[in-house]
């Protein structure tokens, strides 16, 4: 049985950790460097740092903050936001990141993602997917991103059986791209892991979108991190469970319940261990 991972997430805006609901109504949650050190000391398995406005503001990730965070942690650190090129990935790795996630740029320019995977190895590259359920009969974005010449033009567009749509720029831009198809495609480009966020569940504390998580986890052969909706350790257990109705994820990411003190990492792991999930021991 593979060890399951618990991953706190630092969504960073203007140098501060923030958290919202369905990607809006952001509120302050603290200093990223202090929180990183806190979670490392608590026994988190990894840490994710996302500069959530870098892509929409067309700027680079806040390198100096990443460097200061990396100096405080001794667990794997994944960094994303505003990553567009091989050079951007190199800067973040040099600043102390262990893994780099790409989202918007990977959809816009899949070759850039593939080039980064080839340059640094797929163990360093995470594909971040922000997905939203398609409302039956509702509007679907024209997949204008799949312009003539886009390598995924004939494979990725939403079809009659599609259930989730990919969104870019911090959840601001619908794409007309099928999330399940994109996950499989990105794995083929060289992604070593999927960071999958349900926009519908994000921040609501009602549990992960298990259908979405399970569908993508079952479709790819690389690890999947479930994100969006954790309200308690039981929700994480559901996302990590390999039972038919579980999420089949390899890791569970959470923010609100950790940032605002509802649960500690140790409390979470203790409860997950009761669900027969293999966990690395936490620090009290």
Predicted regions and their residues:
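C-terminal helical cap(s) of enzyme catalytic domains, especially alpha/beta-barrels
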Residues: 113-120, 240-283
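Alpha-helix-loop-beta-strand connector modules within alpha/beta enzyme cores
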Residues: 57-80, 115-130, 205-231, 275-277
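Conserved anion-binding
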Residues: 12-14, 18, 97-195, 200-201
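Hydrophobic faces of well-ordered beta-strands that scaffold small-molecule active sites
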Residues: 4-10, 19, 47-49, 77-81, ...
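Short, acidic/polar
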Residues: 28-40, 84-90, 175-185, 235-236
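Catalytic cores of alpha/beta
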Residues: 73, 77-99, 135, 211-251
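Conserved, mostly hydrophobic/aromatic
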Residues: 11, 39, 47, 79, ...
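Glycine-rich, proline-tolerant flexible connector loops at the mouths of alpha/beta enzymes
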Residues: 46-64, 104, 195-206
